[in-house]
Protein backbone atom coordinates (compact mmCIF):
# COMPACT_ATOMS: atom_id res chain seq x y z
CA UNK A 1 0.00 0.00 0.00
CA UNK A 2 1.36 3.37 -1.00
CA UNK A 3 0.20 5.31 2.07
CA UNK A 4 -0.42 3.19 5.19
CA UNK A 5 -2.56 5.97 6.65
CA UNK A 6 -4.37 6.84 3.44
CA UNK A 7 -7.67 5.44 4.67
CA UNK A 8 -7.52 7.85 7.62
CA UNK A 9 -6.37 10.89 5.65
CA UNK A 10 -8.52 10.87 2.53
CA UNK A 11 -12.26 10.94 1.91
CA UNK A 12 -13.99 8.79 -0.67
CA UNK A 13 -14.57 10.36 -4.06
CA UNK A 14 -16.54 8.46 -6.66
CA UNK A 15 -16.94 9.18 -10.35
CA UNK A 16 -18.27 12.68 -10.90
CA UNK A 17 -21.29 12.99 -13.14
CA UNK A 18 -21.57 15.76 -15.68
CA UNK A 19 -23.97 18.60 -14.76
CA UNK A 20 -27.57 17.53 -15.28
CA UNK A 21 -28.37 20.37 -17.64
CA UNK A 22 -25.56 19.21 -19.94
CA UNK A 23 -25.72 15.44 -19.76
CA UNK A 24 -29.40 15.19 -20.66
CA UNK A 25 -28.67 16.91 -23.98
CA UNK A 26 -26.87 13.94 -25.53
CA UNK A 27 -26.28 10.18 -25.26
CA UNK A 28 -22.61 10.32 -24.28
CA UNK A 29 -21.31 8.64 -21.12
CA UNK A 30 -22.34 10.82 -18.20
CA UNK A 31 -19.13 10.71 -16.15
CA UNK A 32 -16.33 13.25 -16.26
CA UNK A 33 -12.67 12.16 -16.49
CA UNK A 34 -10.78 11.82 -13.22
CA UNK A 35 -7.25 13.18 -12.92
CA UNK A 36 -4.51 10.66 -12.17
CA UNK A 37 -3.53 12.36 -8.91
CA UNK A 38 -7.11 12.05 -7.63
CA UNK A 39 -7.18 8.38 -8.60
CA UNK A 40 -4.01 7.79 -6.62
CA UNK A 41 -5.60 9.37 -3.57
CA UNK A 42 -8.54 6.99 -3.89
CA UNK A 43 -6.19 4.04 -4.32
CA UNK A 44 -4.34 5.09 -1.19
CA UNK A 45 -7.53 4.52 0.82
CA UNK A 46 -7.18 0.74 0.32
CA UNK A 47 -6.03 -0.79 3.62
CA UNK A 48 -4.47 -3.90 2.00
CA UNK A 49 -6.48 -6.05 4.40
CA UNK A 50 -5.07 -9.35 5.59
CA UNK A 51 -8.42 -10.89 4.65
CA UNK A 52 -9.76 -8.82 1.73
CA UNK A 53 -13.52 -9.34 1.99
CA UNK A 54 -13.90 -7.24 -1.18
CA UNK A 55 -12.79 -10.29 -3.18
CA UNK A 56 -14.37 -12.87 -0.89
CA UNK A 57 -17.61 -14.83 -1.21
CA UNK A 58 -19.75 -11.78 -0.41
CA UNK A 59 -17.66 -9.43 -2.54
CA UNK A 60 -16.54 -9.74 -6.15
CA UNK A 61 -17.92 -12.82 -7.97
CA UNK A 62 -14.92 -12.94 -10.33
CA UNK A 63 -12.56 -12.52 -7.34
CA UNK A 64 -10.75 -9.52 -8.78
CA UNK A 65 -7.29 -8.99 -7.27
CA UNK A 66 -8.35 -5.72 -5.70
CA UNK A 67 -5.65 -4.93 -3.08
CA UNK A 68 -2.93 -6.25 -5.40
CA UNK A 69 -4.20 -4.25 -8.36
CA UNK A 70 -4.51 -1.11 -6.25
CA UNK A 71 -0.94 -1.51 -5.02
CA UNK A 72 0.37 -1.92 -8.57
CA UNK A 73 -1.60 1.13 -9.68
CA UNK A 74 -0.11 3.18 -6.85
CA UNK A 75 3.35 2.46 -8.23
CA UNK A 76 2.36 4.16 -11.47
CA UNK A 77 2.95 1.15 -13.69
CA UNK A 78 -0.30 0.96 -15.65
CA UNK A 79 0.62 -2.27 -17.42
CA UNK A 80 0.84 -4.29 -14.20
CA UNK A 81 -2.63 -3.44 -12.79
CA UNK A 82 -4.09 -3.96 -16.27
CA UNK A 83 -2.67 -7.48 -16.28
CA UNK A 84 -3.83 -8.06 -12.70
CA UNK A 85 -7.41 -7.18 -13.66
CA UNK A 86 -7.34 -9.56 -16.61
CA UNK A 87 -6.21 -12.53 -14.53
CA UNK A 88 -9.76 -12.80 -13.16
CA UNK A 89 -11.99 -10.60 -15.29
CA UNK A 90 -12.23 -10.70 -19.08
CA UNK A 91 -14.02 -7.37 -19.31
CA UNK A 92 -13.14 -4.91 -16.51
CA UNK A 93 -14.27 -2.06 -18.78
CA UNK A 94 -17.82 -3.46 -18.60
CA UNK A 95 -17.89 -4.07 -14.86
CA UNK A 96 -16.10 -0.79 -14.13
CA UNK A 97 -18.90 1.08 -15.85
CA UNK A 98 -21.96 -1.05 -15.08
CA UNK A 99 -21.43 -3.22 -12.00
CA UNK A 100 -23.11 -2.04 -8.76
CA UNK A 101 -19.85 -3.09 -7.06
CA UNK A 102 -20.64 -5.71 -4.40
CA UNK A 103 -16.90 -5.50 -3.70
CA UNK A 104 -17.47 -2.05 -2.22
CA UNK A 105 -20.33 -3.35 -0.10
CA UNK A 106 -17.90 -5.89 1.39
CA UNK A 107 -14.98 -3.45 1.79
CA UNK A 108 -13.63 -3.57 5.36
CA UNK A 109 -13.23 0.20 5.40
CA UNK A 110 -16.96 0.41 4.77
CA UNK A 111 -17.71 -0.86 8.28
CA UNK A 112 -17.03 2.58 9.76
CA UNK A 113 -16.25 4.83 6.79
CA UNK A 114 -17.15 5.11 3.11
CA UNK A 115 -15.66 2.16 1.19
CA UNK A 116 -12.80 2.39 -1.28
CA UNK A 117 -13.86 3.58 -4.76
CA UNK A 118 -12.96 0.23 -6.31
CA UNK A 119 -15.19 0.52 -9.35
CA UNK A 120 -13.80 3.85 -10.53
CA UNK A 121 -10.23 2.57 -10.11
CA UNK A 122 -11.03 -0.52 -12.19
CA UNK A 123 -12.66 1.57 -14.90
CA UNK A 124 -9.75 3.99 -15.21
CA UNK A 125 -7.05 1.32 -15.05
CA UNK A 126 -8.51 -0.68 -17.93
CA UNK A 127 -9.20 2.37 -20.12
CA UNK A 128 -5.63 3.55 -19.56
CA UNK A 129 -4.42 0.04 -20.32
CA UNK A 130 -6.23 0.09 -23.67
CA UNK A 131 -4.95 3.57 -24.48
CA UNK A 132 -1.36 2.61 -23.67
CA UNK A 133 -1.55 -0.54 -25.80
CA UNK A 134 -1.32 -3.01 -22.92
CA UNK A 135 -4.44 -4.95 -23.95
CA UNK A 136 -3.38 -7.30 -26.72
CA UNK A 137 -4.70 -10.55 -28.20
CA UNK A 138 -3.79 -13.65 -26.20
CA UNK A 139 -3.16 -16.49 -28.63
CA UNK A 140 -3.15 -20.18 -27.66
CA UNK A 141 0.12 -22.11 -27.62
CA UNK A 142 -1.48 -24.98 -29.54
CA UNK A 143 -4.81 -25.57 -31.30
CA UNK A 144 -6.82 -28.55 -30.09
CA UNK A 145 -8.90 -29.11 -33.19
CA UNK A 146 -12.05 -29.11 -31.04
CA UNK A 147 -15.03 -26.95 -31.96
CA UNK A 148 -17.40 -25.09 -29.63
CA UNK A 149 -20.62 -23.19 -30.32
CA UNK A 150 -21.67 -20.47 -27.90
CA UNK A 151 -25.29 -19.32 -28.23
CA UNK A 152 -25.79 -15.75 -27.05
CA UNK A 153 -23.28 -12.89 -27.05
CA UNK A 154 -23.92 -11.17 -23.74
CA UNK A 155 -21.13 -10.88 -21.15
CA UNK A 156 -21.37 -14.56 -20.18
CA UNK A 157 -21.15 -15.81 -23.75
CA UNK A 158 -18.34 -13.41 -24.59
CA UNK A 159 -16.33 -14.46 -21.53
CA UNK A 160 -16.81 -18.15 -22.29
CA UNK A 161 -15.87 -17.68 -25.94
CA UNK A 162 -12.69 -15.81 -25.09
CA UNK A 163 -11.59 -18.33 -22.47
CA UNK A 164 -12.16 -21.27 -24.81
CA UNK A 165 -10.41 -19.61 -27.76
CA UNK A 166 -7.40 -18.96 -25.55
CA UNK A 167 -7.45 -22.63 -24.56
CA UNK A 168 -6.94 -23.52 -28.21
CA UNK A 169 -10.46 -24.48 -29.26
CA UNK A 170 -12.22 -23.17 -32.37
CA UNK A 171 -15.11 -21.06 -31.10
CA UNK A 172 -18.13 -19.80 -33.01
CA UNK A 173 -20.43 -17.39 -31.19
CA UNK A 174 -24.01 -17.08 -32.47
CA UNK A 175 -26.16 -13.99 -31.89
CA UNK A 176 -29.77 -13.54 -33.04
CA UNK A 177 -29.48 -9.74 -33.25
CA UNK A 178 -27.67 -7.84 -35.97
CA UNK A 179 -24.75 -6.93 -33.70
CA UNK A 180 -22.74 -8.66 -31.00
CA UNK A 181 -23.22 -7.73 -27.35
CA UNK A 182 -26.60 -9.00 -26.19
CA UNK A 183 -28.08 -6.88 -23.42
CA UNK A 184 -24.86 -4.84 -23.31
CA UNK A 185 -25.51 -3.69 -26.87
CA UNK A 186 -29.22 -2.96 -26.93
CA UNK A 187 -30.31 -3.00 -23.28
CA UNK A 188 -27.80 -0.61 -21.70
CA UNK A 189 -28.14 3.07 -22.69
CA UNK A 190 -25.08 4.80 -24.14
CA UNK A 191 -25.07 7.34 -21.33
CA UNK A 192 -23.98 4.45 -19.09
CA UNK A 193 -21.68 2.74 -21.60
CA UNK A 194 -20.99 3.86 -25.15
CA UNK A 195 -20.88 0.99 -27.58
CA UNK A 196 -17.36 1.61 -28.86
CA UNK A 197 -16.34 0.05 -25.54
CA UNK A 198 -17.83 -3.26 -26.72
CA UNK A 199 -16.40 -2.94 -30.23
CA UNK A 200 -12.92 -2.28 -28.86
CA UNK A 201 -12.98 -5.58 -26.98
CA UNK A 202 -14.48 -7.48 -29.91
CA UNK A 203 -11.47 -6.55 -32.04
CA UNK A 204 -9.24 -8.32 -29.54
CA UNK A 205 -11.47 -11.39 -29.56
CA UNK A 206 -11.53 -11.54 -33.36
CA UNK A 207 -7.73 -11.45 -33.36
CA UNK A 208 -7.79 -14.34 -30.88
CA UNK A 209 -9.78 -16.41 -33.35
CA UNK A 210 -13.37 -16.14 -32.10
CA UNK A 211 -15.81 -16.28 -35.02
CA UNK A 212 -18.95 -14.15 -34.68
CA UNK A 213 -22.17 -14.94 -36.53
CA UNK A 214 -25.01 -12.44 -36.17
CA UNK A 215 -28.61 -12.60 -37.31
CA UNK A 216 -28.77 -16.32 -36.56
CA UNK A 217 -31.51 -17.64 -34.27
CA UNK A 218 -30.51 -21.05 -32.97
CA UNK A 219 -33.64 -23.17 -32.74
CA UNK A 220 -35.05 -21.56 -35.87
CA UNK A 221 -32.37 -20.92 -38.49
CA UNK A 222 -30.31 -23.82 -37.13
CA UNK A 223 -31.86 -26.44 -34.86
CA UNK A 224 -30.31 -27.39 -31.57
CA UNK A 225 -29.66 -30.93 -32.78
CA UNK A 226 -27.93 -29.65 -35.90
CA UNK A 227 -25.71 -27.53 -33.69
CA UNK A 228 -24.84 -30.52 -31.49
CA UNK A 229 -23.86 -32.56 -34.55
CA UNK A 230 -21.77 -29.75 -36.01
CA UNK A 231 -19.81 -28.88 -32.85
CA UNK A 232 -17.99 -30.90 -30.19
CA UNK A 233 -19.62 -28.86 -27.40
CA UNK A 234 -22.35 -26.25 -27.08
CA UNK A 235 -22.65 -23.47 -24.51
CA UNK A 236 -26.02 -21.83 -23.87
CA UNK A 237 -25.73 -18.22 -22.71
CA UNK A 238 -28.89 -16.57 -24.00
CA UNK A 239 -29.59 -14.64 -20.83
CA UNK A 240 -32.88 -14.41 -18.95
CA UNK A 241 -35.00 -12.51 -21.44
CA UNK A 242 -38.45 -13.56 -20.23
CA UNK A 243 -39.78 -10.27 -18.87
CA UNK A 244 -42.10 -10.22 -15.88
CA UNK A 245 -45.51 -9.16 -17.16
CA UNK A 246 -48.30 -7.10 -15.60
CA UNK A 247 -51.57 -9.01 -16.23
CA UNK A 248 -54.06 -6.25 -15.49
CA UNK A 249 -56.93 -4.66 -17.44
CA UNK A 250 -55.59 -2.23 -20.01
CA UNK A 251 -52.24 -3.94 -20.59
CA UNK A 252 -53.10 -4.16 -24.30
CA UNK A 253 -53.45 -0.39 -24.75
CA UNK A 254 -51.09 1.51 -27.01
CA UNK A 255 -48.40 3.30 -25.06
CA UNK A 256 -47.81 0.38 -22.68
CA UNK A 257 -44.50 -1.34 -23.38
CA UNK A 258 -41.92 -3.62 -21.85
CA UNK A 259 -38.76 -1.78 -20.84
CA UNK A 260 -36.56 -3.71 -23.26
CA UNK A 261 -38.79 -2.80 -26.21
CA UNK A 262 -38.29 0.85 -25.32
CA UNK A 263 -34.57 0.74 -24.52
CA UNK A 264 -33.68 -1.35 -27.57
CA UNK A 265 -35.29 1.18 -29.92
CA UNK A 266 -33.34 4.10 -28.49
CA UNK A 267 -30.06 2.18 -28.48
CA UNK A 268 -30.56 1.44 -32.17
CA UNK A 269 -31.34 5.09 -32.92
CA UNK A 270 -28.21 6.17 -31.07
CA UNK A 271 -26.20 3.71 -33.17
CA UNK A 272 -27.72 5.08 -36.37
CA UNK A 273 -29.75 1.92 -37.04
CA UNK A 274 -33.19 2.36 -38.57
CA UNK A 275 -36.08 1.34 -36.29
CA UNK A 276 -38.69 -0.51 -38.33
CA UNK A 277 -41.19 -1.12 -35.53
CA UNK A 278 -43.72 1.49 -34.43
CA UNK A 279 -41.66 4.20 -32.69
CA UNK A 280 -41.72 4.34 -28.90
CA UNK A 281 -40.70 7.73 -27.57
CA UNK A 282 -41.21 9.77 -24.41
CA UNK A 283 -40.94 13.16 -26.10
CA UNK A 284 -43.60 15.49 -24.73
CA UNK A 285 -45.25 12.67 -22.77
CA UNK A 286 -46.18 11.92 -19.17
CA UNK A 287 -44.16 8.82 -18.40
CA UNK A 288 -44.71 6.25 -15.65
CA UNK A 289 -42.12 3.53 -15.07
CA UNK A 290 -43.33 0.52 -13.10
CA UNK A 291 -40.36 -1.09 -11.36
CA UNK A 292 -37.71 0.46 -9.15
CA UNK A 293 -34.55 -1.33 -10.27
CA UNK A 294 -31.69 -0.50 -12.63
CA UNK A 295 -33.75 -1.16 -15.75
CA UNK A 296 -36.39 1.26 -14.52
CA UNK A 297 -33.68 3.83 -13.91
CA UNK A 298 -32.38 3.31 -17.45
CA UNK A 299 -35.89 3.99 -18.75
CA UNK A 300 -36.07 7.22 -16.77
CA UNK A 301 -32.70 8.44 -18.03
CA UNK A 302 -33.75 7.65 -21.58
CA UNK A 303 -37.07 9.46 -21.14
CA UNK A 304 -35.29 12.58 -19.85
CA UNK A 305 -33.01 12.66 -22.90
CA UNK A 306 -35.96 12.17 -25.24
CA UNK A 307 -37.67 15.20 -23.70
CA UNK A 308 -40.48 13.78 -21.57
CA UNK A 309 -42.99 16.16 -20.02
CA UNK A 310 -42.83 14.49 -16.60
CA UNK A 311 -41.56 11.21 -15.15
CA UNK A 312 -42.79 8.97 -12.32
CA UNK A 313 -41.46 5.68 -10.97
CA UNK A 314 -43.56 3.25 -8.95
CA UNK A 315 -42.13 0.41 -6.88
CA UNK A 316 -44.20 -2.32 -5.21
CA UNK A 317 -41.72 -2.87 -2.37
CA UNK A 318 -41.42 -0.54 0.65
CA UNK A 319 -38.92 2.31 0.62
CA UNK A 320 -35.48 1.04 1.77
CA UNK A 321 -33.78 2.63 4.79
CA UNK A 322 -31.34 5.51 4.13
CA UNK A 323 -28.37 3.47 5.38
CA UNK A 324 -27.46 -0.22 5.60
CA UNK A 325 -30.35 -2.29 6.90
CA UNK A 326 -29.82 -4.61 9.88
CA UNK A 327 -31.10 -7.41 7.66
CA UNK A 328 -28.00 -7.08 5.47
CA UNK A 329 -25.07 -6.61 7.86
CA UNK A 330 -21.53 -6.16 6.56
CA UNK A 331 -20.07 -7.78 4.46
CA UNK A 332 -23.38 -8.52 2.68
CA UNK A 333 -24.59 -6.26 -0.12
CA UNK A 334 -26.41 -3.50 1.81
CA UNK A 335 -30.14 -3.03 1.47
CA UNK A 336 -30.45 0.75 1.48
CA UNK A 337 -31.93 3.64 -0.46
CA UNK A 338 -29.98 4.50 -3.61
CA UNK A 339 -30.47 7.52 -5.82
CA UNK A 340 -29.40 6.98 -9.42
CA UNK A 341 -28.35 9.44 -12.09
CA UNK A 342 -31.88 9.32 -13.53
CA UNK A 343 -33.48 10.21 -10.21
CA UNK A 344 -31.17 13.23 -9.97
CA UNK A 345 -32.35 14.31 -13.41
CA UNK A 346 -35.94 14.54 -12.21
CA UNK A 347 -38.43 11.96 -11.05
CA UNK A 348 -41.40 11.51 -8.75
CA UNK A 349 -40.44 8.26 -7.02
CA UNK A 350 -43.00 6.35 -4.95
CA UNK A 351 -42.84 3.06 -3.04
CA UNK A 352 -45.47 0.54 -1.92
CA UNK A 353 -47.54 1.17 -5.04
CA UNK A 354 -49.62 -1.49 -6.78
CA UNK A 355 -50.96 -0.79 -10.27
CA UNK A 356 -54.46 -2.24 -10.60
CA UNK A 357 -55.53 -1.21 -14.10
CA UNK A 358 -54.83 1.05 -17.07
CA UNK A 359 -57.50 2.96 -18.95
CA UNK A 360 -57.42 4.91 -22.17
CA UNK A 361 -59.18 6.64 -25.02
CA UNK A 362 -59.40 5.31 -28.58
CA UNK A 363 -57.05 2.49 -27.67
CA UNK A 364 -54.33 4.76 -26.24
CA UNK A 365 -53.43 4.70 -22.55
CA UNK A 366 -54.37 7.88 -20.70
CA UNK A 367 -54.49 6.90 -17.02
CA UNK A 368 -52.90 4.55 -14.52
CA UNK A 369 -54.99 3.37 -11.57
CA UNK A 370 -53.45 2.01 -8.40
CA UNK A 371 -53.35 1.92 -4.64
CA UNK A 372 -50.88 1.84 -1.82
CA UNK A 373 -50.02 -1.48 -0.22
CA UNK A 374 -48.36 -2.76 2.93
CA UNK A 375 -46.38 -5.96 3.28
CA UNK A 376 -47.74 -8.11 6.08
CA UNK A 377 -47.69 -11.83 6.71
CA UNK A 378 -45.64 -12.50 3.61
CA UNK A 379 -48.04 -10.78 1.21
CA UNK A 380 -49.07 -7.34 -0.03
CA UNK A 381 -52.43 -6.01 1.09
CA UNK A 382 -54.11 -2.78 -0.09
CA UNK A 383 -54.15 0.18 2.26
CA UNK A 384 -57.79 1.24 2.80
CA UNK A 385 -58.89 4.39 0.99
CA UNK A 386 -55.57 4.72 -0.86
CA UNK A 387 -56.86 4.33 -4.42
CA UNK A 388 -55.57 6.90 -6.90
CA UNK A 389 -55.28 7.57 -10.61
CA UNK A 390 -52.60 9.40 -12.58
CA UNK A 391 -52.44 10.72 -16.13
CA UNK A 392 -50.08 8.77 -18.36
CA UNK A 393 -49.16 8.78 -22.05
CA UNK A 394 -46.38 6.17 -21.82
CA UNK A 395 -46.22 3.32 -19.30
CA UNK A 396 -43.02 1.26 -19.19
CA UNK A 397 -42.92 -2.13 -17.47
CA UNK A 398 -39.52 -2.64 -15.82
CA UNK A 399 -40.31 -5.29 -13.23
CA UNK A 400 -37.40 -7.59 -13.92
CA UNK A 401 -37.09 -10.95 -15.64
CA UNK A 402 -38.41 -14.37 -14.68
CA UNK A 403 -35.76 -16.47 -16.44
CA UNK A 404 -34.65 -17.69 -19.86
CA UNK A 405 -37.10 -17.98 -22.74
CA UNK A 406 -37.97 -21.68 -22.82
CA UNK A 407 -40.17 -21.76 -25.91
CA UNK A 408 -37.85 -22.47 -28.81
CA UNK A 409 -34.30 -23.75 -28.45
CA UNK A 410 -34.37 -24.82 -24.80
CA UNK A 411 -37.60 -26.82 -24.98
CA UNK A 412 -36.70 -28.33 -28.35
CA UNK A 413 -33.35 -29.51 -27.00
CA UNK A 414 -35.01 -31.06 -23.96
CA UNK A 415 -32.87 -29.47 -21.26
CA UNK A 416 -34.10 -29.75 -17.69
CA UNK A 417 -34.97 -26.77 -15.52
CA UNK A 418 -34.50 -26.10 -11.83
CA UNK A 419 -37.25 -24.97 -9.45
CA UNK A 420 -36.66 -21.33 -10.44
CA UNK A 421 -37.16 -22.04 -14.11
CA UNK A 422 -33.49 -21.64 -15.05
CA UNK A 423 -31.57 -24.34 -16.92
CA UNK A 424 -30.34 -27.02 -14.53
CA UNK A 425 -26.64 -27.98 -14.68
CA UNK A 426 -24.10 -30.06 -12.76
CA UNK A 427 -20.97 -28.68 -11.10
CA UNK A 428 -19.20 -28.43 -14.45
CA UNK A 429 -22.14 -26.46 -15.90
CA UNK A 430 -23.23 -29.36 -18.13
CA UNK A 431 -26.96 -29.82 -18.63
CA UNK A 432 -28.70 -33.19 -18.72
CA UNK A 433 -27.57 -33.40 -22.38
CA UNK A 434 -24.07 -34.68 -23.08
CA UNK A 435 -21.83 -31.91 -24.36
CA UNK A 436 -24.42 -29.16 -23.83
CA UNK A 437 -23.57 -26.60 -21.16
CA UNK A 438 -25.33 -23.52 -19.78
CA UNK A 439 -24.10 -20.46 -17.93
CA UNK A 440 -24.85 -16.88 -17.00
CA UNK A 441 -28.45 -15.76 -16.57
CA UNK A 442 -29.65 -18.79 -18.57
CA UNK A 443 -28.46 -20.97 -15.71
CA UNK A 444 -28.51 -18.49 -12.81
CA UNK A 445 -31.53 -16.34 -13.56
CA UNK A 446 -31.39 -12.57 -13.99
CA UNK A 447 -28.36 -11.25 -12.14
CA UNK A 448 -25.41 -8.86 -12.32
CA UNK A 449 -23.01 -8.45 -15.22
CA UNK A 450 -20.12 -9.50 -12.98
CA UNK A 451 -21.93 -12.75 -12.16
CA UNK A 452 -22.48 -13.33 -15.88
CA UNK A 453 -18.76 -13.00 -16.56
CA UNK A 454 -17.90 -15.27 -13.63
CA UNK A 455 -20.35 -17.90 -14.83
CA UNK A 456 -19.10 -17.67 -18.40
CA UNK A 457 -15.58 -18.37 -17.20
CA UNK A 458 -16.71 -21.32 -15.08
CA UNK A 459 -18.76 -22.75 -17.92
CA UNK A 460 -15.74 -22.44 -20.20
CA UNK A 461 -13.65 -24.38 -17.69
CA UNK A 462 -16.28 -27.13 -17.67
CA UNK A 463 -16.36 -27.25 -21.46
CA UNK A 464 -12.57 -27.32 -21.65
CA UNK A 465 -12.40 -30.29 -19.28
CA UNK A 466 -15.08 -32.10 -21.26
CA UNK A 467 -13.24 -31.55 -24.53
CA UNK A 468 -9.98 -32.77 -23.03
CA UNK A 469 -11.35 -35.85 -21.26
CA UNK A 470 -14.72 -36.55 -22.86
CA UNK A 471 -16.31 -36.30 -19.41
CA UNK A 472 -17.81 -33.63 -17.22
CA UNK A 473 -16.45 -33.00 -13.72
CA UNK A 474 -19.27 -35.11 -12.25
CA UNK A 475 -18.62 -37.96 -14.67
CA UNK A 476 -14.90 -37.86 -13.91
CA UNK A 477 -15.53 -38.45 -10.20
CA UNK A 478 -17.55 -41.61 -10.79
Segments (PLM) and residue ranges:
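Beta1-alpha1 glycine-rich phosphate/pyrophosphate-binding loop at the start
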Residues: 5-32, 44, 63-75, 82-85, ...
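Feature captures the FAD/FMN-dependent oxidoreductase FAD-binding
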Residues: 142-143, 147-151, 199-248, 356-370, ...
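A conserved FAD-binding loop/helix module that cradles the flavin
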Residues: 296-300, 442-467
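FAD-site-proximal beta/loop scaffold in flavoenzymes
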Residues: 252-284, 376-446
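Ferredoxin-type iron-sulfur electron-transfer modules in oxidoreductases and energy-metabolism complexes
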Residues: 23-42, 64-97, 101, 112-142, ...
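Short cysteine clusters
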Residues: 46-60, 95-99, 103, 107
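Beta1/beta-strand and adjacent pyrophosphate-binding region of the FAD-binding site
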Residues: 143-156, 282-293
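C-terminal catalytic lobe of FAD-dependent flavoproteins
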Residues: 4, 13, 18-37, 42-45, ...
Amino acid sequence: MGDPKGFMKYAREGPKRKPIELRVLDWKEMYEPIAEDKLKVQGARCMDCGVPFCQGSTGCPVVNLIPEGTELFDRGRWEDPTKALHTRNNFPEFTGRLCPAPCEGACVLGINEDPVSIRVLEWNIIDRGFNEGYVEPVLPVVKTGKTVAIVGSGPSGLAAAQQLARAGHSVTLFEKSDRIGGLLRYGIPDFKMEKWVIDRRLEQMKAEGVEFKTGVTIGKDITGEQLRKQFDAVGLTMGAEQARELPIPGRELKGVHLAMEYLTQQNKRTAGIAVTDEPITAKGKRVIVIGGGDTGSDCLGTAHRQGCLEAHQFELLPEPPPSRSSSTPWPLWPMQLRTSHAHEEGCDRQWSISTTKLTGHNGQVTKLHGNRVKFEGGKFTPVPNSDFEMDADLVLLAMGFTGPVKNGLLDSLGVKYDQRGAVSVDESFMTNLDGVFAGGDTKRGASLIVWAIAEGRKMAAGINQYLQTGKSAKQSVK
